[in-house]
């Protein structure tokens, strides 16, 4: 069983509002369509989520301006999600959109609808999104957060994160030409020893992956989504990426 997250930096131009990389979406989905044990897909927002969230003060207190922003961010994320869903349907897959904003009940997320879709043979697709945190504030639940929840609920064999880098390095490869790609990381390592922030968020992602490992049987993988065919090399000597065991 595999769960997989497509990073927003892979399928959007993060510097240009609501600009999708449609070729990347199609190439990734083409690979995903051949994975029989893929049970859940999550994707980030990139320029469909972050830009307007920052502009309207999300996450943050509930007020007239942030409420408008809430609607805009959710609409934009739905539009990006529809592109992913359309590509999956075109490849013969059975996706079903399950927005995280609709799963919030009594201060927690209830994934019962998502699990039911998996049991029925569908591939649920969720994404980082806004949600009503309480009567006074709005929150944002990231794709990484959803992946952590899915790992705990489903106990998959493999969890995969597709990003715009080849993996986690020993040092920042942009500043250190001698940086080495860490192909296999023991969970006892600390990020202080992995002096890398090649995307501006690898540190946080690394921590999320380490926390997930206890719920994933055969490793949490970080793979360059611009080369989705590398998913097929998981477990092989030729694999390029990072696995946390």
Swiss-Prot record:
Characterize activity with respect to temperature: Optimum temperature is 70 degrees Celsius.
- Description of pH dependence: Optimum pH is 6.5-8.5.
Its Enzyme Commission number? 2.7.4.26
What positions does the entry give for substrate binding? Answer: 45, 50, 143
Q: What is this protein called?
A: Isopentenyl phosphate kinase
Q: What does this protein do?
A: Catalyzes the formation of isopentenyl diphosphate (IPP), the building block of all isoprenoids. Has lower activity with isopentenyl thiolophosphate (ISP). Has low activity with dimethylallyl phosphate (DMAP), 1-butyl phosphate (BP) and 3-buten-1-yl phosphate (BEP). Has no significant activity with geranyl phosphate (in vitro).
List the PANTHER family.
GLUTAMATE 5-KINASE (PTHR43654), ISOPENTENYL PHOSPHATE KINASE (PTHR43654:SF1)
Q: Which GO terms describe its molecular function?
A: ATP binding; isopentenyl phosphate kinase activity; kinase activity
